[in-house]
Regions:
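Class I SAM-dependent methyltransferase SAM/SAH-binding core
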Residues: 1-32
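A short SAM/SAH-binding and catalytic strip from SAM-dependent methyltransferases
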Residues: 30, 41-57
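Local beta-strand N-terminus motif with an aromatic residue
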Residues: 40-41, 67
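Short "lid" loop at the C-terminus of a central beta-strand within the Rossmann-like core
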Residues: 52, 75-80, 119-121
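A short glycine-rich, Lys/Arg-flanked "PGG" loop and its adjoining helix->strand segment in the class I
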Residues: 56-72
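Short, glycine-/aromatic-enriched active-site segment of Class I SAM-dependent methyltransferases
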Residues: 75-93
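Short alpha-helix
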Residues: 95-110, 114-116
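Conserved Class I S-adenosyl-L-methionine
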Residues: 114-184
Length: 184
C-alpha cells in the first residue's frame, strides 16, 4: 500500500487476530508491478490503488502475482461529509462507477469476476478541524481561497461545539465495490 497509515492499521488488525503470514509492502502498485522484486503470492489485495494509469496493464500484473485469488476495492459512494461539503460549495460530487468499467474489462480479459457491495459506517477520529480540513482538501478537486474559507466556516459550524484542537469523532459512511476472483 502507498499509505503507511493503512499498512499500520492492517498490521495492528493482523496482530490482534493472530495473523502472521502477511507481507507488508509500502509502495504504490505501479512501483510494485513495474519491478520483478515481488514474487507471486496466494492472495493479492488492491484497495483504492487502481484509480488511474493503465488499468488493464495493472490488473494483468496483479493477476499474474496472484496464485489463488485477487481482491480489489473501489469507492462507489462518497461519505456524507464529502457530499455535504460539495453541496455547500455548489459543486456536484460525482459518484465513482469505476468498478463497472473494471468488471467489463475483466470480462474482456477472460476473468469471470464477482462484485460485492460493502456499506461502511465507521467512527472517524480527527485531530481537530484542521485535520478534517486537510483531508477534505486532499480529496477535493482544487479549492480556491474562497472555497477554503467556506469549508473552514462550514466545519467550524458543524463541529464548533467541540474544542477546535481536540479529537473530533463522527460517523463516516461510504459504499465500496469489492471486485474479486479466484484463480483456476
Amino acid at each position: 500500500d502507498i499509505s503507511g497509515e493503512m499498512l499500520r492499521l492492517l498490521k495492528s488488525n493482523a496482530e490482534k487476530h493472530g495473523i502472521a503470514n502477511i507481507r507488508y509492502i509500502h509502495r504504490s502498485w505501479e512501483e510494485t508491478c513495474s519491478t520483478d522484486t515481488i514474487e507471486p503470492h496466494d492472495v493479492v489485495v488492491a484497495s483504492r490503488s487502481l484509480m488511474a494509469g493503465n488499468l488493464r496493464e495493472s490488473i494483468s500484473r496483479i493477476d499474474r502475482l496472484a496464485r489463488r485469488a485477487v481482491y480489489m476495492t473501489f469507492p462507489v459512494v462518497h461519505s456524507s461529509l464529502d457530499r455535504e461539503v460539495y453541496r455547500m460549495l455548489g459543486r456536484t460530487l460525482t459518484e465513482n462507477p469505476l468498478y463497472l468499467s473494471i468488471y467489463a474489462m475483466l470480462f474482456q480479459m477472460g476473468i469471470m469476476a464477482n462484485v460485492d457491495m460493502i456499506r461502511s459506517v465507521r467512527t472517524a477520529q480527527y485531530n481537530g478541524i484542521d485535520d478534517i480540513f486537510d483531508r477534505i482538501r486532499w480529496r477535493a478537486d482544487e479549492l480556491s481561497d474562497t472555497d477554503e474559507i467556506k469549508v473552514r466556516k462550514f466545519l467550524e459550524e458543524k463541529f464548533g461545539e467541540q474544542n477546535p484542537s481536540s479529537v473530533i469523532t463522527f460517523n463516516r459512511d461510504s459504499l465500496w465495490a469489492l471486485v474479486w476472483w479466484r484463480k483456476a
